[in-house]
């Protein structure tokens, strides 16, 4: 019998990307939104702090073990922005399209060789809300921010994030391929090795 866990995210893209993999780990994944759990305010200063906040909150509200991911895009030329604010880069009412638009505007006068970026994912697993020894797994993918959007797949900044390893943006990859090589896939692989 699979262990029930709550996936502490309201982001449908993350649920889609993570649920299948976690199911393969032997978990029965329940999205927090399916339990009527809202996301807590993200007050951490790092990805790991925010992932812990989300996991503790979801575990407390659900009574189940929890897995949370906090991730974002870190652009060197912008001193790490959008970083922790990747989902809200264009403001609280922003969306993926507005976030990408703002990023392109911020980088408009930045040369190609200075557009390095990385996607970072920090995943936390807690047995219960007061678990003193959470499992923490991190993964990252390095790339470059393009000058225009390319590709139809993915979500967030995928259409701007060019992966030299893949020779295309994340949005040009098939979903199944991205699931194998993304920052989140790398963090999930680390998590699996620690479970």
Curated annotation (Swiss-Prot):
InterPro entries: dITP/XTP_pyrophosphatase (IPR020922), ITPase-like_fam (IPR029001), RdgB/HAM1 (IPR002637). The keyword Chloroplast does not apply. It comes from the Bacteria. Pyrophosphatase that catalyzes the hydrolysis of nucleoside triphosphates to their monophosphate derivatives, with a high preference for the non-canonical purine nucleotides XTP (xanthosine triphosphate), dITP (deoxyinosine triphosphate) and ITP. Seems to function as a house-cleaning enzyme that removes non-canonical purine nucleotides from the nucleotide pool, thus preventing their incorporation into DNA/RNA and avoiding chromosomal lesions. Binds 1 Mg(2+) ion per subunit. This is dITP/XTP pyrophosphatase. It is an enzyme of class 3 (hydrolase). Keywords: Hydrolase, Magnesium, Metal-binding, Nucleotide metabolism, Nucleotide-binding. The keyword Metal-binding applies. Homodimer. Belongs to the HAM1 NTPase family. It catalyses: XTP + H2O = XMP + diphosphate + H(+); dITP + H2O = dIMP + diphosphate + H(+); ITP + H2O = IMP + diphosphate + H(+).
């Amino acid at each position: 019998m699979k262990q029930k866990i709550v996936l502490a995210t309201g982001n449908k893209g993350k649920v889609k990307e993570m649920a299948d993999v976690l199911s393969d780990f032997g978990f029965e994944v329940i999205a927090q939104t399916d339990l009527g759990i809202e996301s807590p305010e993200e007050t951490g200063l790092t990805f790991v702090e925010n992932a812990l906040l989300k996991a503790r909150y979801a575990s407390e509200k659900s009574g189940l073990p929890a897995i949370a991911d906090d991730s974002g895009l870190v652009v060197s030329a912008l001193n790490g922005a959008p970083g922790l604010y990747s989902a809200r880069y264009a403001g609280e009412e922003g969306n993926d399209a507005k976030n990408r638009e703002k990023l392109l505007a911020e980088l408009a006068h930045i040369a190609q060789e200075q557009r390095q970026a990385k996607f970072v994912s920090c995943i936390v697993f807690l047995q219960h809300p007061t678990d003193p020894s959470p499992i923490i797994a991190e993964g990252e993918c390095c790339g470059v921010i393009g000058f225009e959007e390319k590709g139809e797949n993915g979500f967030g900044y995928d259409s701007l994030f060019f992966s030299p390893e893949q020779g295309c943006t994340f949005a040009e990859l098939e979903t199944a391929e991205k699931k194998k090589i993304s920052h989140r896939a790398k963090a999930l692989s680390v998590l699996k090795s620690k479970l």
